[in-house]
Amino acid sequence: MRDIARGWRVDGSTIGLVPTMGALHAGHMSLVEAARRENDRVVVSVFVNPIQFGPGEDLARYPRSAERDLSMLRGAGVDAIYKPSAADMYPAGASTRVVVHGVADSLEGAARPGHFEGVATVVTKLLTATSADRAYFGQKDAQQVAVVQRLAADLDLGVEIRVCPTVREDDGLALSSRNAYLSGPERMAAVCLSRALGHAAEAYGRGERNPDRLRAILRKAIESEPLAQLEYAEVVDPATFSTPGSIAVLAVRIGKTRLIDNRDLRLPYPG
């Protein structure tokens, strides 16, 4: 990958990177489309990163659809598909990890210890391997976006972090590779996340700014769904993930499947 990127650099081409873990869906492809519009060359990485999964998480059963992914990416006209192995990324003896403090400590960072250390490490390695000018992430993973933005700024990586809107199903459910785990009833129940965010956005649009009341609105909507178990509901600053703020964020278990979603409450409702 480095040799390919060097050749593009010699030609004066700009490079866009779309990091993925595979199991691609329309949300990923929207990132690819944005990268194609804004760069001469587009690289999509497909790598299920083992060090961002904790004990008991779904590394072994994470959805994988290699042939389908390759077909989608070829059809989208990407210039390179980067599929390193775990041994390529973390050879024997590798002991360096990238740790982002502050923004990575709360919510997802607290619920999944070591997760953002794994994310920050793999993103740094992917950016280095591809010499990307721009890297594309979805707003659905809002805290990951904030962590990567902090990483890029603090390490002077010279890469622009581009954030693209969350892509949703017609009923509001945010697209996620983990949606494949949901049974029929669970899939119907999962709409409670976007419904809760909509209720909070509606209240915010009417002038509600009290974080306790906004959190209560989120909790009530989730707790009204029998199949849902709330892990957290918070309203945070989009850059620091401290409170108070203007981004409503949720983590909810629907059956055994853990889903996250968020919404910028400053956007008009509906929006």
Q: Whereabouts are the PLM-identified features?
A:
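Substrate/ligand-engaging "lid" and interaction regions
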Residues: 233
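Short, basic/aromatic-enriched C-terminal tail that caps enzymatic domains
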Residues: 242-271
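Nucleotidyltransferase catalytic core that binds NTPs
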Residues: 1-227, 236, 240, 256, ...
